[in-house]
């Protein structure tokens, strides 16, 4: 049989990167399969076809009976079994060597002087080896190792079933054959049937032990990962996980995590304007002047405290001064301009310009708006009518009128 040294060296390298049960499995494969098969099985099955004899002189009958009794030699069958069962382990070893080589290249690139700045955000993969220098069985390597065990188990089961259907688990000394070109049923005899039966049972037991080790290794890996998941600390509460807990699903309402404060709702209010109280205690909303006074109907009696025409002129003058208030405030903000000549009032008398002390501006502390309060007085009557001027002077004295409006 061929040399097993090359396969043995490969499997020895794979043993360094296996679990404890995997190392036991490889030991069983080395000692109880490869060594026993190379040392003893060839000696037992070396004279298999030469010592297979049949009680006939028909040419070719003995060969066809041997082919029917042993479709494939036991030794070659076990060699194929060893190769197929070892192939998943060799694939796993290739994956390990690939990862180790990639890590070595990465270290070489890190030792080289940096060249042009590459794209940022590149994260280096996790190191393949741990602190003790052993290869970590995790991630993609763990998946490869699990598939390695699964395929080894399937190959073991397949070869055990194939051996049973081809030969059975026992060789009988007598084999009856009626295959053409034998003239009739002939008796054929197998050499050393008891010794061969012992070898068959031994190799079957080794295959069952390997199958049991594969099952235990799968259980060991599953229990180990489950234990790590139970004993590992909880993941930190990241902003992404917090945002994912509030994300609506399928248009359903937001689901807040337990023990969380209700979301804050901001309600907007219109700006608050402080009312400006006049000297008579009356209040009016700033920025909303009263409508102009209605026109006096003929025959309507005048307001008390003065003639009817005098009251109408005073109210009209108040309204005109209110309309001119925005212009007055804009002139205060601009540089002083020459004072225009006094305009005539509707009553025929010159209208005096408002003194600076007559208008005061009061602004809100928050800067929301400015309110200007203006006190307006009726102009004096011409001296032609002494009775009317006395009444006007009495009504337009230093005190405020009832019809005046503070803005």
Curated annotation (Swiss-Prot):
Cysteine pairings via disulfide bonds: 54-188, 61-182, 65-177
Key words, A-Z: Cell junction, Cell membrane, Disulfide bond, Gap junction, Membrane, Phosphoprotein, Transmembrane, Transmembrane helix
Protein name: Gap junction alpha-3 protein
Entry-linked PANTHER family: CONNEXIN, GAP JUNCTION ALPHA-3 PROTEIN
Extracellular topological segments: 41-71, 170-197
Position of the signal peptide: none
High-level lineage: Eukaryota, Metazoa, Chordata, Craniata, Vertebrata
Source organism of the structure: Bos taurus
Subcellular location: Cell membrane; Cell junction, Gap junction
SUPFAM superfamilies reported for this sequence: Connexin43
Skewed-composition ranges (Low complexity): 356-370, 387-399
